[in-house]
């Protein structure tokens, strides 16, 4: 470096004797310079600022360290020196006697990227002595200078916030791990590096010695999504050594930084409740099966996945290791219908490797979750009585009963599925006959006519994992039911029962024309008469004609289209005979 060795170019000061001679010349004030009266020799440096940058954040002052290029010529245009020819910038402190006086004065007030033409009179250059073999005595010197860098040993890191998001969940602190994009330039705008060309962010710890000191300082306090301009003096960057061929010695560095995300290895899952429905009577625990919608994004807002785009909830067990640990933790304690934001550090998500092409390594993940429903495989039907006519509730529905009921069915998020009111008539069912889902069958039992209930039916007592037409798989169903009517059912296997003992000589009563045989017409007429007279009843909920036809087929043993006295036998007698045979 220039401070350590002998002079390497003509701008450096002469030996002490020559210096003392030059200092005898009275210096004139700094400025554009002026000639002596009557066209005599120049009294001061003449400065022509022929290119001034539009923005000048700082000007060269006494004691600043500068880096610049120059061409030096005589009045006739003959070149005597050039930093360009040496492919080396001048890097030196201004105003402390390291440069000829004319150059010291000519650099004062200069901006980075400014270009100046300087005319240095002999007494502010190399005087009457000159430089043997290079600069003759009393030579006026002409310099074309471009300033590329300026800094001072008192400088600190300069941070300018270009964009700061309105919501800042956390700021960078020492020991945090950050992911950021950057463009790196020298102070004159020369680019030396960028993360954007490398297909990924720059990922590192802050304050742990992994970065240059100035970047460690410049990142502190940043928010995810914030953009900063960070100007770093060389003694907080790469100093005298520079870096390879891209960062010269003693170069100030400028970084334009976009912080993508930040976390700390000690971070846990962060929860934020966005919407909590009233009346949360149950919260999810490990072992529950949950259906939820989500939007998944990186900390800078980049969306990487969404269940909404698939028009299907994400269905899984909670706390069983089927999903990333952070989501397993974040879903527990949630209510049905709740909306919450779950922020998951990478060590509880996909770690250093990331996954696929949308989640990079060491990425913090943010999930906005809407819990649709959850249940436990051991859940029974939840029954809540809404209204019950106590004064008329003498009998309740039981297995085998034939019932009429109205119902509304929806998902727990309020999505309407079915309603008996859409059909203009109550639904009918025989309890225990497996004609309705098990949970609804269970929920109807024990109801009085006129009673209203709310039933919460878990999927294993409804339509299971596969769902049904209009019903998603693994969906918990919500029913509001009202029992309209009920009839006692018949014993299993019976199509008709007598209210009292059957008539004696049953065949004679059935043989209406007394011809010794009963065709289907006579049989049907007889059974219908028993029902209309209240002496017996058919299996409820079935087509009477079909039921009577089945009864006739059972009695017509030889299938000849008529029943004889020998063929006719009551079911109770058949059951008794079967018991005897088994015995």
Curated annotation (Swiss-Prot):
First and last residue of the signal peptide: 1-27
Free-text description of this protein's post-translational modifications in UniProt: Glycosylated and phosphorylated.
Biological role: PPIases accelerate the folding of proteins during protein synthesis.
SMART domains, alphabetized: EFh (SM00054)
Reactions the enzyme catalyzes: [protein]-peptidylproline (omega=180) = [protein]-peptidylproline (omega=0)
Protein's cellular compartments: Endoplasmic reticulum lumen
Organism phylogeny: Eukaryota, Metazoa, Chordata, Craniata, Vertebrata
Biological process per Gene Ontology, one example term: wound healing
Positions of short motif Prevents secretion from ER: 580-583
Organism annotation: Bos taurus (Bovine)
Ranges of residues in domain PPIase FKBP-type: 63-151, 175-263, 287-375, 400-487
GO cellular component terms, semicolon-separated: endoplasmic reticulum; endoplasmic reticulum lumen; membrane; mitochondrial intermembrane space
Residue numbers binding Ca(2+) 2: 556, 558, 560, 562, 567
Residue positions with a glycan: 71, 183, 295
Protein name: Peptidyl-prolyl cis-trans isomerase FKBP10
EF-hand domain segment(s): 498-533, 543-578
Keyword tags: Calcium, Endoplasmic reticulum, Glycoprotein, Isomerase, Metal-binding, Phosphoprotein, Repeat, Rotamase, Signal
Modulation of this protein's activity: Inhibited by both FK506 and rapamycin, but not by cyclosporin A.
Stretches for region Disordered: 534-583
CDD domains in alphabetical order: EFh (cd00051)
Pfam families: EF-hand_5 (PF13202), FKBP_C (PF00254)
Binding site for Ca(2+) 1: 511, 513, 515, 517, 522
Gene name of the encoded protein: FKBP10
E.C. number(s) listed in UniProt: 5.2.1.8
Record bears the keyword DNA repair: no
């Amino acid at each position: 470096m220039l401070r350590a060795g002998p002079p390497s170019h003509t701008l450096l000061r002469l030996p002490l004797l020559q210096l003392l001679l030059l200092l005898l010349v009275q210096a004139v004030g700094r400025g554009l310079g002026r000639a002596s009266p009557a066209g005599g020799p120049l009294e001061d440096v003449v400065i022509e600022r022929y290119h001034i940058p539009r923005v000048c954040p700082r000007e060269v002052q006494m004691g600043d360290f500068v880096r610049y290029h120059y061409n030096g010529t005589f009045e006739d245009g003959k070149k005597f020196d050039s930093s360009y020819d040496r492919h080396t910038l001048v890097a030196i402190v201004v105003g402390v006697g390291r440069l000829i006086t004319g150059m010291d004065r000519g650099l004062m007030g200069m901006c980075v990227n400014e270009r100046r033409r300087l005319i240095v009179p002999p007494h502010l250059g190399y005087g009457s002595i000159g430089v043997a073999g290079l600069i003759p005595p009393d030579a006026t010197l002409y310099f074309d200078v471009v300033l590329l860098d300026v800094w001072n040993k008192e400088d600190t890191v300069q941070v300018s916030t270009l964009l700061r998001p309105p919501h800042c969940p956390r700021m960078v602190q020492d020991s945090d791990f950050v992911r950021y994009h950057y463009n790196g330039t020298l102070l004159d705008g020369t680019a030396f590096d960028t993360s954007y060309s490398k297909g990924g962010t720059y990922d590192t710890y802050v304050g742990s010695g992994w970065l240059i000191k100035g970047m460690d300082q410049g990142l502190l306090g940043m928010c995810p999504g914030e953009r900063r301009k960070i100007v770093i003096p060389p003694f907080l960057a790469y100093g005298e050594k520079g870096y390879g061929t891209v960062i010269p010695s003693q170069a100030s560095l400028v970084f334009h930084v976009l912080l993508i995300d930040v976390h700390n290895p000690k971070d846990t899952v962060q929860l934020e409740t966005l919407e909590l429905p009233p009346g949360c009577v149950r919260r999810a625990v490990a072992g529950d099966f949950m259906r939820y919608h989500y939007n998944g994004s990186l900390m800078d807002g980049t969306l990487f996945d969404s269940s909404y785009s698939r028009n299907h909830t994400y269905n899984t067990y909670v706390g069983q290791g089927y999903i990333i640990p952070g989501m397993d933790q974040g879903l527990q304690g949630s209510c049905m219908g709740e909306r919450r934001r779950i922020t998951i550090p990478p060590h509880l998500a996909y770690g250093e490797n990331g996954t696929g092409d949308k989640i990079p390594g060491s990425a913090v993940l943010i999930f906005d979750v809407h819990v649709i429903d959850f249940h436990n495989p051991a859940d029974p039907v939840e029954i809540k009585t809404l209204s019950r006519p106590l004064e008329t509730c003498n009998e309740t529905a039981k297995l085998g009963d034939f019932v009429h009921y109205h119902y509304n069915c929806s998902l727990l998020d309020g999505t309407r599925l079915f309603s008996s009111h859409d059909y203009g008539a109550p639904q009918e069912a025989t309890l225990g006959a497996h004609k309705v889902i098990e949970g609804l069958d269970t929920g109807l039992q024990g109801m009085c006519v006129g009673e209203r209930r709310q039933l919460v039916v878990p999927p294993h007592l409804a339509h299971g994992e596969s769902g049904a037409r209009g019903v998603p798989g693994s969906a918990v169903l919500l029913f509001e039911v009202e029992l309209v009517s009920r009839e006692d059912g018949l014993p299993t296997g019976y199509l008709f029962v007598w209210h009292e003992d059957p008539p004696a000589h049953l065949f004679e009563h059935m043989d209406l024309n007394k011809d010794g045989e009963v065709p289907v017409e006579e049989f049907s007429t007889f059974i219908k008469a028993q029902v209309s007279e209240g002496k017996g009843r058919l299996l409820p909920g079935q087509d009477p004609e079909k039921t009577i036809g089945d009864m006739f087929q059972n009695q017509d043993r030889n299938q000849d289209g008529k029943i004889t006295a020998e063929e006719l036998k009551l079911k109770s007698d058949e059951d008794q005979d079967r018991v005897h045979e088994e015995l």
